[in-house]
Amino acid sequence: MGVVAAVVGSVFAGFGLYQLLLAVAAFGYRPPQATGSPTKRVTVLVPAHDEEALIGRCVESLNAQSYPRELYEVVVIADNCTDDTAEVARKAGAAVLVRNEPEARGKGRALRWAIDRLLAREWPPDAVAVVDADSVAAPGFLETLVRPLEEGALAAQGESLLFDDGSAAAAFRAGAFLLVNRVRPAGRAVLGLPCNLQGNGMLFSRGVLRANPWEAYSATEDLEYSISLLLAGIEPRFAGGAIVQSPAAPSAEAASHQQLRWEGGKLNVARTQLGRVLAGAFRRRDPKLLEVAFDLAVPPLGLLTALAATGTGLTAIGIGVGYLPAWAIVPWGVALGAIPLYVLTGFRAAGAPASAYRSLARAPVFVLKKLGAVPRLLRFRAESWVRTERESGRDR
């Protein structure tokens, strides 16, 4: 049993050390630089379901980009809305596509519907960006996001971050977004590895969308489509500095539901796609695809920490009662040590504010809650577009 405990602990140690490696590598990341005047014609798609409260400021931020105005347009998809999303978006200066197909709900289906219409135009755009309706884009977002495509990439991903409203809960979640959506993709870029799509702040060339139609409809459609592209040999490139920010969920309950969608969705994709990715990696002898499989297998950070702590505790008990040898705890100790080192190193690499460090005082409670959420995470199968609770505006 000592060997079994050590082997399982070694897997968790590998997960922790892998993330620590990415955090260290992130120090070497440099954002893409302009090599000339922009040339790509871009349509920015904004899928929106009942977002009348926030769609106006999103469109305004996109209309204020430093990218040449004649080269881009903002198109809002008012998807199965029961409020005034479409009217607010038009008043803010966006073109609007209204979709009423209640039998085919979901962000992925809305994107496929709109992309098909864009590509059917006589003069389709060179590239299509996707921005969430509750986001605010930094002025240089689009200009920075397009640079990888100007350099020959076929898809790109910017930084999808959260606003820190000053509360401890928001600071904690904003810090987590820094790690997942800035540090890890930056580290992977430095190591020559592809970037996972994050759902918000994505960009695709017209050719990619024609050759690889959007057929990702799960709660984590971004990760699902990432895998489809990677298996097709297309590597999304990270565009650090192309920032879109969204508000944190306004309540603990809303945050819990949001995390369930994201984390449960990732576990569901891992269950259904890990075998395909591994098979593709070995068939093509592709080490990058093997890394993608490993990254897909890494549990969400809170769950990873909870499981590592539990494994360490159980191993320590087994040693204490003489059931396990003392050396069995070594890999578990490595795992439990690598995780906080990853967080602190990642915060430093990301230039995290002091509030992110202070918010770590919430980590023990967060980890305990993760243990209680394991059954729900494993059962998660949501495919409908579940809108996050807002402080204002109608909800579904």
Which residues are covered by each model-predicted region?
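A conserved acidic beta->alpha catalytic loop
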Residues: 78-86, 101-103, 136
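Long helical/loop segments within the catalytic core of UDP-sugar-dependent glycosyltransferases
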Residues: 98-100, 104-123, 139-218, 260, ...
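Membrane-embedded multi-pass helical conduit in multi-pass membrane proteins
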Residues: 24-28, 34-36, 295-380
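N-proximal low-complexity "stem/linker" segments adjacent to membrane-targeting elements
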Residues: 1-60
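Short beta-strand-to-loop acidic/aromatic patch adjacent to the donor-nucleotide binding site
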Residues: 122-136
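Short, acidic, metal-binding catalytic loop of nucleotide-sugar glycosyltransferases
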Residues: 60-71
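Acidic helix N-cap motif at the loop->helix transition within catalytic regions
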Residues: 56, 83-91, 98, 140
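Cell-envelope/extracellular polymer assembly enzymes that use nucleotide-activated donors
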Residues: 40-43, 73, 224
